[in-house]
C-alpha cells in the first residue's frame, strides 16, 4: 500500500469510530425518553406527562386539548411504546398548516424529527380493546418534546 492509501484508510477508520458514539447516544436518549414517558403514563403522573409538551407559542385551547388527551388513558398499561423516524408522508403532514378548532390555521411550533407510537390494550369482563396514539416528537435543547400547535408564522 502506498502512503496515500494508508492515510486514507486511517482517516476513514477515525471518522467511523468517532461517529459510533453519536448513534449510541441517540438510541440511549430515545430509550430514556420512552421509559420515562411510559412510567409517567402508567403511573398517571400528569405533571411529568405535561412536562413533555413544548408549549412556547402554542394555542391555549389546543394546549388544553393536548393535556386532556395525554391524561385520558393515563394509568392504563402500555403494551408497546416506540419512537420511530418520520416517513416522508409524516414529514409532509408535520409541516402542513391545519385548520384550528378556534379558527384560522395552526402549525407545529417545532419541526418534528420522530413520532411516538403508543399502544394500550385493555381487558375486562366485557372483552378487550386496543387503542393506538401517535404524537410528533421534536428535539429542543437536547431533549425530546411533543410540540403543541400554535398560529402559523
Residue ranges and their predicted role:
Residues 1-7:
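Positively charged n-region of N-terminal signal peptides that target proteins for export
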Residues 9-19:
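Bacterial N-terminal signal peptides
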Residues 20-46, 51, 55:
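Short, low-complexity N-terminal intrinsically disordered segments enriched in polar/charged residues
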Residues 43, 108, 138-142:
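A short, structured loop/turn motif at beta-sheet edges
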Residues 46, 51-71:
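Short, solvent-exposed secondary-structure junction/capping segments
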Residues 53-56, 82-87, 122, 135, ...:
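A mature extracytoplasmic/lumenal domain signature
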Residues 66-130:
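Surface-exposed, charged secondary-structure patches
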Residues 117-153:
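Short beta-strand edge/turn micro-motifs at domain boundaries
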Amino acid at each position: 500500500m502506498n502512503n496515500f492509501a494508508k492515510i486514507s484508510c486511517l482517516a476513514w477508520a477515525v471518522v467511523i469510530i468517532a461517529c459510533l458514539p453519536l448513534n449510541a447516544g441517540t438510541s440511549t436518549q430515545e430509550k430514556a425518553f420512552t421509559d420515562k414517558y411510559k412510567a409517567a403514563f402508567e403511573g398517571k403522573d400528569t405533571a411529568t406527562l405535561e412536562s413533555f409538551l413544548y408549549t412556547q407559542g402554542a394555542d391555549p385551547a389546543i394546549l388544553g386539548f393536548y393535556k386532556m388527551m395525554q391524561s385520558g388513558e393515563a394509568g392504563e398499561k402500555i403494551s408497546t411504546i416506540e419512537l420511530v423516524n418520520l416517513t416522508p408522508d409524516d414529514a409532509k403532514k408535520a409541516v402542513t398548516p391545519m385548520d384550528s378548532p378556534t379558527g384560522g390555521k395552526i402549525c407545529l411550533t417545532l419541526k418534528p424529527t420522530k413520532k411516538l407510537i403508543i399502544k394500550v390494550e385493555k381487558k375486562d369482563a366485557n372483552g378487550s380493546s386496543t387503542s393506538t396514539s401517535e404524537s410528533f416528537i421534536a428535539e429542543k435543547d437536547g431533549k425530546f418534546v411533543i410540540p403543541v400547535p400554535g398560529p402559523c408564522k
